[in-house]
């Protein structure tokens, strides 16, 4: 197991050109970057984690009344084994439970958990901070590529974004199998992901420029930073210049739980996905809209459908430059 520090960028730097260069370098070589002075109040992050604690304390039987049932409006509860991220190597789903909230900026959901509804204003406040940071990062990417600053951000209205509460644990009475994963090896579907971590480590990554020498690299937990990773759509969109890195979660032995919050960023559904630059992007992939892509990936991951048109595989081997 390798150990390297993910690059960390200070967003309070006044010279935008420095931030843009460091951000692009990290996302080209690692696909992951840590951000400090990111603008999201630390007390709001802590408050959202406390709300997540209370949600996961709700009895499983009650949470299961609000199960996620497929589709792009990705909202609802998913219990242990409900999501299998590495179809090739896992015999059953991940050792985690989650609750997803989508449909921003004004979620209107038929199957909304009462606890989530009760605290909707707090979740939406946190989501707005995440979205503001997202737009800033997308503009930095565009500036770095010398294209109009709003090239990416204008296609991200937040209506497809997902705020996910996550708790990794082994259910009572369940024995861990040899091929079990807390979260199987995968790359994310959309444009970028913001990850907030607390307490226990467990995230492992395979940066593109290091995998020849190292297998998996452990990522340390830094509560005051936001961890950002590039996802598949943005890798494809930038012709592989930004890299969507394969990652997984494996909690250390003896650690009972790990909690995180993820904010998944996805282009608006009508956005056409085609490579911006001329470099080869791997095997030919039929152009699809962002909506078609995300529908297919979600439904395949949850076992509702066959692999989607243009599916790249769990090891992300189809769109690497």
From Swiss-Prot:
<dbReference type="GO" id="GO:0005829">
    <property type="term" value="C:cytosol"/>
</dbReference>
<keyword id="KW-0963">Cytoplasm</keyword>
<dbReference type="Pfam" id="PF03171">
    <property type="entry name" value="2OG-FeII_Oxy"/>
</dbReference>
<protein>
    <recommendedName>
        <fullName>UPF0676 protein C1494.01</fullName>
    </recommendedName>
</protein>
<dbReference type="Pfam" id="PF14226">
    <property type="entry name" value="DIOX_N"/>
</dbReference>
<dbReference type="InterPro" id="IPR044861">
    <property type="entry name" value="IPNS-like_FE2OG_OXY"/>
</dbReference>
<comment type="similarity">
    <text>Belongs to the UPF0676 family.</text>
</comment>
<keyword id="KW-0539">Nucleus</keyword>
<dbReference type="GO" id="GO:0044283">
    <property type="term" value="P:small molecule biosynthetic process"/>
</dbReference>
<dbReference type="GO" id="GO:0005634">
    <property type="term" value="C:nucleus"/>
</dbReference>
<dbReference type="InterPro" id="IPR027443">
    <property type="entry name" value="IPNS-like_sf"/>
</dbReference>
<dbReference type="InterPro" id="IPR005123">
    <property type="entry name" value="Oxoglu/Fe-dep_dioxygenase_dom"/>
</dbReference>
<dbReference type="GO" id="GO:0016706">
    <property type="term" value="F:2-oxoglutarate-dependent dioxygenase activity"/>
</dbReference>
<dbReference type="InterPro" id="IPR050231">
    <property type="entry name" value="Iron_ascorbate_oxido_reductase"/>
</dbReference>
<feature type="domain" description="Fe2OG dioxygenase">
    <location>
        <begin position="159"/>
        <end position="267"/>
    </location>
</feature>
<dbReference type="InterPro" id="IPR026992">
    <property type="entry name" value="DIOX_N"/>
</dbReference>
């Amino acid at each position: 197991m390798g150990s390297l520090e993910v690059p960390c960028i200070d967003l309070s730097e006044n010279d935008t050109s420095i931030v843009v260069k460091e951000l692009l370098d990290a996302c080209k070589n690692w696909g992951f970057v840590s951000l400090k002075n990111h603008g999201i109040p630390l007390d709001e992050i802590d408050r959202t984690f406390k709300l997540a604690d209370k949600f996961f304390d709700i009895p499983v039987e009650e949470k299961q009344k609000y199960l996620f049932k497929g589709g792009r409006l990705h909202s609802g509860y998913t219990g242990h084994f409900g999501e299998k991220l590495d179809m090739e190597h896992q015999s059953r789903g991940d050792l985690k439970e989650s609750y997803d909230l989508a449909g921003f900026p004004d979620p209107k959901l038929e199957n909304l958990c009462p606890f989530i509804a009760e605290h909707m204003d707090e979740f939406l406040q946190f989501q707005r901070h995440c979205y503001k940071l997202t737009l800033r990062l997308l503009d930095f990417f565009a500036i770095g590529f010398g294209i109009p600053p709003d090239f990416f951000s204008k296609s991200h209205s937040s209506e497809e974004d997902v705020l996910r509460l996550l708790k990794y644990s082994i259910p009572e009475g369940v024995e861990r199998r040899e091929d079990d994963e807390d979260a199987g090896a995968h790359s994310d579907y959309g444009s970028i992901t913001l990850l907030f971590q607390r307490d226990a480590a467990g995230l492992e990554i395979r940066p593109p420029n290091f995998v020849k020498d190292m297998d998996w690299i452990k990522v340390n937990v830094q509560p005051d930073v936001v961890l950002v990773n590039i996802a598949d759509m943005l890798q494809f969109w930038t012709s592989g210049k930004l890299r969507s890195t394969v990652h997984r979660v494996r909690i250390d032995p003896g650690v009972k739980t790990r909690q995180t919050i993820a904010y998944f960023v996805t282009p608006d559904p009508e956005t056409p996905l085609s490579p911006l630059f001329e470099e080869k992007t791997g095997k030919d992939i039929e152009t699809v809209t962002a909506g078609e892509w995300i529908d297919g990936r979600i439904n395949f991951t949850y076992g509702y459908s066959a692999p989607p048109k243009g599916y790249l595989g769990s090891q992300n081997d189809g769109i690497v430059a």
